[in-house]
Amino acid sequence: MESWVFERGSLTRRLKAACGADFNVRVIRQGFAHPFPDEALLLKLRSGRRALVREVELRSRERRLVLARSVLPAQTLKGAGRRLAHLGNRPLGEILFASRRPRRHGFEAALAEDRHWRPAVRAGSGSAGPVWGRRSLYSIAGRPLLVAEFFLPAVLSVPESA
């Protein structure tokens, strides 16, 4: 699990290499919402500000491997960042790591209790307890975005060498 959690490059690229054509993204929810207080603090958003919140599953066929939550402030969605609001079933990492490495400003990893997840996300996670999660603060063209990823037990069945 450690090599997945502490992957420095694109998690999307690594999963695609390991899963091939079976890799897919399912959007759980996407829309403007109030970020969690700790997310707003990391993004330096004023109280009450909304941001684009996107929650997805990264999957191999129907098998859920990773749950991801991205928070993109309105300022990040301007100019070249506008395309980030219209990803559909494309993975954010595909855009984030496309041209050059995005700038990572912070990285946290911890065990996350599934009782803290939204019920819709928790359902069918395959987890009977805590799972490893990580959170990274990136900037694109000087504008921030926050990405959190939670590694479900099924990710252990994906080849580590990918």
Curated annotation (Swiss-Prot):
<dbReference type="GO" id="GO:0042866">
    <property type="term" value="P:pyruvate biosynthetic process"/>
</dbReference>
<feature type="binding site">
    <location>
        <position position="149"/>
    </location>
    <ligand>
        <name>substrate</name>
    </ligand>
</feature>
<protein>
    <recommendedName>
        <fullName>Probable chorismate pyruvate-lyase</fullName>
        <ecNumber>4.1.3.40</ecNumber>
    </recommendedName>
</protein>
<keyword id="KW-0456">Lyase</keyword>
<dbReference type="InterPro" id="IPR028978">
    <property type="entry name" value="Chorismate_lyase_/UTRA_dom_sf"/>
</dbReference>
<keyword id="KW-0670">Pyruvate</keyword>
<feature type="binding site">
    <location>
        <position position="54"/>
    </location>
    <ligand>
        <name>substrate</name>
    </ligand>
</feature>
<dbReference type="GO" id="GO:0005829">
    <property type="term" value="C:cytosol"/>
</dbReference>
<keyword id="KW-0963">Cytoplasm</keyword>
<keyword id="KW-0831">Ubiquinone biosynthesis</keyword>
<dbReference type="GO" id="GO:0008813">
    <property type="term" value="F:chorismate lyase activity"/>
</dbReference>
<feature type="binding site">
    <location>
        <position position="92"/>
    </location>
    <ligand>
        <name>substrate</name>
    </ligand>
</feature>
<dbReference type="Pfam" id="PF04345">
    <property type="entry name" value="Chor_lyase"/>
</dbReference>
<dbReference type="GO" id="GO:0006744">
    <property type="term" value="P:ubiquinone biosynthetic process"/>
</dbReference>
<comment type="similarity">
    <text>Belongs to the UbiC family.</text>
</comment>
<dbReference type="InterPro" id="IPR007440">
    <property type="entry name" value="Chorismate--pyruvate_lyase"/>
</dbReference>
<comment type="function">
    <text>Removes the pyruvyl group from chorismate, with concomitant aromatization of the ring, to provide 4-hydroxybenzoate (4HB) for the ubiquinone pathway.</text>
</comment>
<comment type="pathway">
    <text>Cofactor biosynthesis; ubiquinone biosynthesis.</text>
</comment>
